[in-house]
Amino acid sequence: MTISPGANIAGRVIIGDRTYVGMGAIVLDSLTVGRGAVIAAGSVVTRDVPDHVQVMGAPARVTRERVEGR
């Protein structure tokens, strides 16, 4: 898991392996971020993030599915 500077993880968030949280991203309380997920810089995550997807925006939406291992 990589959490960039300025990212804000609020409360009890479960973050999976091989996950990247971009600079200035906000992940709200009581959410799960799946394995291999990427949260783009400045995104606001308001709901659970599935495994192997990229999310971005405010509120964050899935913008692409990622192939495991890439």
Identify the residue ranges that each predicted region occupies:
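A glycine/serine/threonine-rich, flexible loop-to-helix segment
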Residues: H52, V67-R70
